Amino acid sequence: MIISALFVVGHDCAHEALFKSKFLQYWIGQIAMLPSLHAYNQWGYGHNRIHHGHTIKRQADFVWHPTTKEEYSEFGIFKKLTHRFFWSIWGGGFYYMIEIWFKGMVLFTAPLKEAKRDKLIMLSFAFISSGLVFILELLLSPEFLILELVCGCLQRFV
């Protein structure tokens, strides 16, 4: 819940709705979006220029893009299964992580000079925080981590 609330703060900063100062808007937005692993300017470009600029326009809005019956009938079996899963109640999170976050935040770089820097900040935060969580778990409960690693490795062979 806290990460979602912080994301909303970052969203409002990206819309330049919270502060008059662009400096404050950027840094508060950047910090607020880091826990959800979103690069501030990268996300702002995709959200403000592409999504809001082309909301519900077929082939332009990368977030909301319904498929016609004709398009769906031309899909192969794997694409049909993927499409049905992504648009089901269970698939929304997977859809977001793959189609929006991974393809839009990690693979794509917005044509803004700040986008590369923000992506580097976000990816650095992701790797450093993951490493810190691993180290903390090791320091606080080494036997649990070792058991987890051994059991995880053994499960692959069973």
Identify what each model region corresponds to.
Residues M1, L34-V150:
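Non-catalytic, topology-defining segments of multipass membrane proteins
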Residues I3-K22, W43-I56, V158:
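Acidic (Asp/Glu-rich) catalytic motifs at the cytosolic membrane interface
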Residues K20-P35, V63-W64:
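Post-HEXXH active-site segment of zinc metalloproteases
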Residues L149-V158:
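Internal helical hairpin/lid segments
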